[in-house]
Amino acid sequence: MTLRTSNQLFDAYFTADGMAEVFCDQGRVQGMLDFEAALARAQARVGLIPQAAVAPIAQACLASLYDVDALGVAIATAGNSAIPLVKALGKLIASEDAGAERYVHLGATSQDVMDTGLVLQVRQALALIDADLARLGDVLAAQAQRYATVPLAGRTWLQHATPVTLGMKIAGWLGAVTRNRQRLAQLKPRLLVLQFGGASGTLAALGEHAMPVAEALAAELQLGLPEQPWHTQRDRLVEFAAVLGLIAGSLGKLGRDISLLMQTEAAEVFEPSAPGKGGSSTMPHKRNPVGAAVLISAATRVPGLVATMFSAMPQEHERSLGLWHAEWETLPDICRLVSGALKQALLVSEGLQVDAERMARNLDLTQGLVLAEAVSIVLAQRLGRETAHHLLEQCCKRAVAEGRHLRAVLADEAQITAELSATELDRLLDPAHYLGQAHTWVTRAVTEHFALNA
């Protein structure tokens, strides 16, 4: 199968191969042809058309039999992809079996073909995304446990705050992955449904056979049968797009964190290295976060596409003019971008390179200031909150002004040494002893992940 991709220079970077195949032109055409073949089988099952007509129709429902370029030219005149495809399908069937041709597309409308074909593609896309999310969850769970007790500087407003652990940070990424997997599972039965309403949504052309055909068609395609056709009720697709937007944003957060940890000034965590990866055309020393860039790019691009899906919701009456058309490329583009981000997230997370020694050195860049809160909390129990806070604030200012370690300044303060022994001060200024519930958060995130897998 030849993939007619939109941008071969960049697709390998921004799109996973599996998703590119789902949404290539042949994939679109095959989805629509699968609808037509299933429609014939369903109508024969309920006695609406002869059983003998099914085989000629089904045999013609292979995307490889059609000239995609010619279909593309015809779409520009027809206004949608189903019209020229159904004409080509009928012509091909008639060349082999003139009697069977009359039963093609019976009772359906173009949007039935296109929407159901899209749902069949979305089912494949959903399976790919869910599998990658599950795999990413496994990787992050392992990494969170591996680094559960490794301290690094917590950063708020891009400045050192109090110590956290790398495992806790990774557990945060894991929690988002788990929630997004839960969202996909919840929307799946709403999303994977048949579109079948005929001209204006009533299936009047099929008379008393309408519901039996609809039920049989849904069964043939292994899709749910909705309470009614949804030609201009697009919330199902928009909900899917919105969840993909959440996934892109969550992956963007992961990419942003890693890229910041890779900065020269931090140099604590790195993407896996490989020959030719992350280099510069002019600077031999560079090690750029090329994987994180894809995650951040997707998180930047997808929200605008999701907004397009939301903007296309108020569709007119029983068939939309233009708003439906706005979805055609938008949802596939969202799927492509999320697939590429997931691909890179897996590569980055699996090969994460960690410099724990650098983390420890960075924790001490402020010479103990990141642990001022730890001292203040204990001192407050003995001197009162306001007194303790004011005293520590003055000591911190003095440490900065004099370029000294906070531990040394505290040792010079009689009011503090009267309350805290040298051993207590040493312990309070040890990052490993001020990690709070960091390990608990890791355990809870990992437990929730594996509970979802059970």
Regions found by a protein language model. Give the residues of each.
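A helix-coil-helix interface module used to build multimeric assemblies
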Residues: T2-A204, H209-A214, K277-S280, V290-I296, ...
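A conserved active-site cap/scaffold subdomain adjacent to cofactor or substrate pockets
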Residues: Q233-E268, G276-C335
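Long, amphipathic alpha-helical stalk/connector segments used for oligomerization, subunit docking
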Residues: R301-R385, L391
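A glycine-rich, basic-preceded beta-loop-alpha segment at the flavin cofactor/substrate interface
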Residues: V104, G224-P229, F270, A307-E318, ...
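Short, well-ordered beta-strand elements within core beta-sheets of diverse protein domains
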Residues: Q121, M168, V238-L246, A374-R382
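A short, charged helix-loop
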Residues: E215-H231
